[in-house]
């Protein structure tokens, strides 16, 4: 999967996100606008790996916040409540266990 090409395609189509299966993993590409705030979420049976492709992205947990920039990543533990926000806009790749 070519992330640069995929994000460019999303931008050209005016879309914010796309999800594709890849080797048993769901890969979700998200273009987060400046000031964008996601909803609180949790995953009861899988971790979620968050990779920031570009920009600044905050992964907020109930008890702490991680600020990530392009090229950085973190893993959201199974069951952890979290949400993503971006003060300046970001392109983010999310990896979770694929749906059976």
Residue map of PLM features:
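Short acidic-glycine-tyrosine-enriched beta hairpin
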Residues: 63-78
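A cytosolic small-molecule/anion-sensing beta-strand core signal
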Residues: 53-54, 69-70, 88
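Short, conserved beta-strand element in jelly-roll/cupin
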Residues: 42-59
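A short, N-terminal "cap"/entry segment at the start of jelly-roll beta-barrel domains
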Residues: 1-33, 39-40
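Structural motif
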Residues: 56-58, 65, 81, 91
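Conserved hydrophobic/aromatic positions in well-ordered beta-strands
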Residues: 28-30, 50, 93
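Short histidine-centered beta-strand/loop micro-motifs
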Residues: 18-21, 38-44, 61, 85-86
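Ligand-binding loop in jelly-roll beta-barrel domains
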Residues: 78-100
């Amino acid at each position: 999967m070519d992330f640069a090409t995929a994000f460019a395609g999303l931008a050209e189509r005016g879309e914010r996100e796309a999800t594709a299966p890849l080797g048993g993993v769901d890969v979700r590409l998200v273009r987060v606008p400046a000031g964008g705030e996601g909803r609180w979420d949790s995953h009861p049976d899988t971790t979620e790996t968050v990779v920031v492709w570009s920009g600044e992205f905050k992964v907020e947990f109930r008890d702490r916040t991680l600020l990530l920039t392009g090229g950085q990543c973190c893993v959201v533990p199974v069951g952890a409540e979290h949400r993503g926000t971006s003060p300046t806009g970001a392109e983010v790749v999310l990896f979770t266990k694929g749906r059976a």
